[in-house]
Amino acid sequence: MLKKLFFILSKEDKNFLFFLLVFSVFISFIETFAISLVMPFITLASDFSYFDRNKYLISLKEYLNIPVFEIIVYFGVGLIVFYVFRALLNAYYFHLLARFSKGRYHAIAYKVFSKFLNINYEKFTQKNQSEILKSITGEVYNLSTMISSFLLLMSEIFVVLLLYALMLLINYKITLFLSIFMVLNAFILVKILSPIIKKAGVRREEAMKNFFEILNTNLNNFKFIKLKTKEDGVLSLFKAQSEAFSKANITNESVAAVPRIYLEGIGFCVLVFIVVFLVLKNESDISGILSTISIFVLALYRLMPSANRIITSYHDLLYYHSSLDIIYQNLRQEEENLGEEKLSFNQELKICNLSFGYEGKKYLFKNLNLNIKKGEKIAFIGESGCGKSTLVDLIIGLLKPKEGQILIDEQELNANNTKNYRQKIGYIPQNIYLFNDSIAKNITFGDAVDEEKLNRVIKQANLEHFIKNLPQGVQTKVGDGGSNLSGGQKQRIAIARALYLEPEMLVLDEATSALDTQSEAKIMDEIYKISKDKTMIIIAHRLSTITQCDKVYRLEHGKLKEEK
C-alpha cells in the first residue's frame, strides 16, 4: 500500500507527510505527559504530608516559601494551562491533517486528469468516459479519505504505545492483563469485521462504476429516452445501482460504529475490574491507590477512542483500497512524450507503405501509399467502418503507424515534431461539442481572445449576420452542447473554431452529414471559398460535398482507389 501511495504523492507531499508523522509523535508525547501529570497532582492534593516526607518537595516548599495549598493551586492552574495548550495543539494538528488529506484531492485529481490528457490518442479511445469521470471525481476523493485514515491510524498508534509504556511503569501486572484482554478483543473485532468491509468496498466500487456508466449513457441519449418514453426503465437501472452503492456505504458506516460501542462496553468493564482489584489489594489504604486509579481512568478514557479510531481507520484502508489501486494504475499509464521540433509543410505529404491496426485487432491497412500536395483538396469515401476516420487520424498525427511512415516535405513525422505538426491542422468533426459558454469562448477554445482574428473568422464562417442580431453578440451563451443553436449555427461556429487557429490544413470528418442538402451545399461552398490556399482533407458520405475536390479516393478492404 505504501509503495503505491508514495508513487502517487509528489516529493513535497511526501516531505509534508513525514512532517505530520513526526508531529504526531510529538503530540503523542504531549498526550502522555499530560496524563502522567494527573497522578502526582491527585497524590499531592489528597495528602499534604508528602511535602514533609519527600526531600524534593521539602526543597521546593522551602524555595517557594508559600503554604502547601498555594503550591497545589498553582500546580492545578499550571495543569489547566497545559491541558488547554494540549487541546490547541491537537486542534492545529487535526487542521494540518485535514489540509493535507483533503488538499490531496485537488493535487491528485489534477495529476489524474493531466495523465488522461497526455496519454496517446489510441489509448484514450479505448477508455470508458464514465470510468474517467469516476476516477477523477469519486476515486480521488476516496483516496484523500484513505490518506486521512492512514495518518490518523499512525497518530493513534503512537499515542497508544506511549500511554501503554506509562501504564507499564505504574503497574505492569494490571497493564499486561489489560493488554492481553484488549488485544484479544480487538483481534476478534478485526477478524469478524474486515471481510465484511472488504466485500462492501468491492460492491461500492462496482456500483459506483455502473452508476457513472448509467448517468453518462442516458444523459447523452436524453432525446431518445423522451421519444421512446423509456424514463421508467432508465430510472429502474439507476435505482438498482444507486441502492447498491448506498447499501455498501450503509454496511461500512454500520460496521464502523461497532468497534466504538463494543470497546466502550469492554472499557467500562475493565475499569471496574481495575478499581475492584486495587481496592481488594489495598483494603487498609484506599487513599494510597486513588492516584493509581485516577491515572488508569484517564489513560483508559484516552485509549478507548484511540483503539476505536485505529480499528475504524484500518477498516477505511480496506474499504477504499480499490480506489488506491485504480488511481495507481491510472497514473502508471504511459504518456505521449512529444518534442518541440519544428516541421514545415510547404510541398507535399507522403504516406509510404503504411500499415495500421488497433491494439489487439487485425490491421485495417497494409502497405498503403498516398501523396497529398500542399494546397490540394482531397476526399475519402467508402462504406461505414472501412477506416476513413482512422486513416485521417493517422494523417493528422493522432495515431501512429504500426509499419511504414508519413513524410512531410521528406521529413518523417515522429514524436519530436508531431506537436508542431498538429498545430498546423484545423479539425471539424462530425459530432460538434460546444460547451456552455459564450460564442467567443467556443470559437477561441481556451486561447486568448484576439478581437481582430475573432471578427475575421466570424465573417469567414458567415456568422456575422447571425451574431449581430443577438442582444449580447459574441458573448451570447450557446447552452450545454450548443442547445440554444441550430445545426447550421453550430456547424459555422465549429468552422470558425478551426479557422481561428489559422491552420495550413483543414480536415472535415463528415462535418456536414447532420445538415440538410441545401445547408450542406451552402456551408461547403463557404469552406471551399475560405480555404483556397489551404490543404483540405474531407471524409464524406454525400458525393455532392466533394465536387470541388482535386482528388477523390475510395477506401475499400484496406486499399485506396482513386476515383477522380
From Swiss-Prot:
Main localization of the protein described in the UniProt heading: membrane
Q: Which cysteines in this chain are paired by disulphide bridges?
A: none
Effect after changing R260A: Abolishes translocation of lipid-linked oligosaccharide
Q: Which residues lie on this side of the membrane: Extracellular?
A: 39-76, 171-173, 277-292
Query: Where do the ABC transporter domain residues begin and end?
Result: 349-564
> Where does the chain bind ATP?
G382, E383, S384, G385, C386, G387, K388, S389
Task: Please tell me, according to the UniProt entry, what happens when changing L506A.
Answer: Reduced efficiency of the N-linked protein glycosylation pathway
Q: Which residues lie on this side of the membrane: Cytoplasmic?
A: 1-15, 99-149, 198-254, 315-564
How does the protein associate with the membrane? Answer: Multi-pass membrane protein
Give the catalysed reaction(s), semicolon-separated: ATP + H2O + lipopolysaccharideSide 1 = ADP + phosphate + lipopolysaccharideSide 2
User: What do the Gene Ontology cellular component annotations say?
Assistant: plasma membrane
The terms under GO molecular function for this entry are:
ABC-type transporter activity; ATP binding; ATP hydrolysis activity; ATPase-coupled lipid transmembrane transporter activity; lipopolysaccharide floppase activity
Compartment(s) of residence: Cell inner membrane
Q: Which CDD domains match?
A: ABC_6TM_PglK_like
Q: What happens when you mutate R302A? A: Abolishes translocation of lipid-linked oligosaccharide
Reported impact of E510Q: Abolishes ATPase activity and strongly reduces translocation of lipid-linked oligosaccharide
The impact of changing K388A is: Reduced efficiency of the N-linked protein glycosylation pathway
**Which PANTHER family is this protein grouped with?**
ATP-BINDING CASSETTE SUB-FAMILY B (PTHR24221), ATP-BINDING CASSETTE SUB-FAMILY B MEMBER 6 (PTHR24221:SF654)
- Name of this chain's protein: Protein glycosylation K
